[in-house]
Curated annotation (Swiss-Prot):
Family: Belongs to the PNP/MTAP phosphorylase family. MTAP subfamily.
EC number: 2.4.2.1
Swiss-Prot/TrEMBL site (Important for substrate specificity) positions: 164, 217
Reaction catalysed by this enzyme: a purine D-ribonucleoside + phosphate = a purine nucleobase + alpha-D-ribose 1-phosphate
GO molecular function: S-methyl-5-thioadenosine phosphorylase activity
GO terms for cellular component: cytosol
InterPro entries: MTAP, Nucleoside_phosphorylase_d, Nucleoside_phosphorylase_sf, Purine_phosphorylase-2_CS
Record keywords, A-Z: Glycosyltransferase, Purine salvage, Transferase
Protein name (database record): Probable 6-oxopurine nucleoside phosphorylase
GO biological process: L-methionine salvage from methylthioadenosine; purine ribonucleoside salvage
Residues reported in the UniProt entry to bind substrate: 181, 205-207
Length: 263
């Protein structure tokens, strides 16, 4: 299995996969349930990060188990989806954003596989947090199939599960484009495992203080439901275009440490 999709809020069923089968993977961090199926002859995995029916809040997701499970199955490429609030007036509900940067405002999450417990510590480069190769395929494909997607976006990740205050949003809007609760530490852990990771955010609402109305989770789900077909269509078109050989920074993220015998 080379490719996996991680579905966020409102994305619990890949639908385009043939013969989907639930599998369980044991990891040092806990058991993970996911689906595997076939798309155009390619075995593809699908993991619902919030669990079936959105039963796991963002701050309780077992990110390390999820990423370890995908790595153990041989996954080299991950396409993820996230529901986000917009920090900019030009990013309207229903828009897709192909993320290129993130800012981490989480507080209580385990961000690394290398905590030093076994004497191993790494300091990984994050100049390009999201796989440039996958991002380019996503954007070029979106143009080919007529789906509007913003080619860049900075994701501000908060701890959750509450929505943000207008004061927080005012601060975040100075340096971010969208705000969500799940991309960190997922993107970090993927790089530590040398997995290519790209994320498409679907704008579901304007953030607090930008929107004149109070925010509700039902509003997020409603907009996600109305627009999720765009994400499915994009991923379905992208998967056959993902090359078997990787020509990106991700596959050698730990090369320096391996060469020095530190891993």
């Amino acid at each position: 299995m080379r490719i996996a999709i991680i579905g966020g809020t409102g994305v619990y069923d890949p639908k385009f996969l043939e013969n989907p089968e639930e599998i369980k993977v044991s990891t040092p961090y806990g058991e993970v349930k996911l689906l595997k199926g076939i798309y155009q002859g390619e075995e593809v995995g699908f993991l619902a990060r919030h669990g079936a029916g959105h039963t796991v809040p963002p701050h309780r997701i077992n990110y390390k188990a999820n990423m370890w499970a995908l790595k153990s199955l041989g996954v080299e490429r991950i396409l993820s989806t996230t529901a986000v609030g917009s920090l900019k007036l030009n990013l309207v509900p229903g828009d897709l954003v192909i993320l290129d940067q993130f800012i981490d405002f989480t507080k209580n999450r385990d961000h690394t596989f290398y905590n030093g417990d076994d004497g191993k510590v790494i300091h990984i480069d994050f100049t390009n947090p999201y796989c440039p190769e996958l991002r380019n395929i996503l954007y070029e494909t979106s143009k080919e199939i007529g789906i509007k997607a913003h080619p860049f976006g900075t994701y501000v990740c908060t701890e959750g599960p509450r929505f943000e205050t207008p004061a927080e949003i005012k601060m975040y809007s100075f340096f971010g484009d969208v705000v969500g609760m799940t991309n960190v530490p997922e993107v970090i852990l993927a790089r530590e495992l040398e997995i290519c990771y790209a994320s498409v955010s679907l704008v579901t609402n304007y953030a607090a203080g930008i929107s004149p109305n109070p925010l509700t989770h039902s509003e997020v789900l409603e907009v996600m439901t109305q627009n999720i077909e765009k994400v499915r269509k994009l991923f379905a078109a992208v998967i056959p275009k993902i090359p078997k050989e990787r020509n990106c920074i991700c596959k050698n993220a730990l090369k320096e440490y391996r060469e020095k015998g530190l891993l």
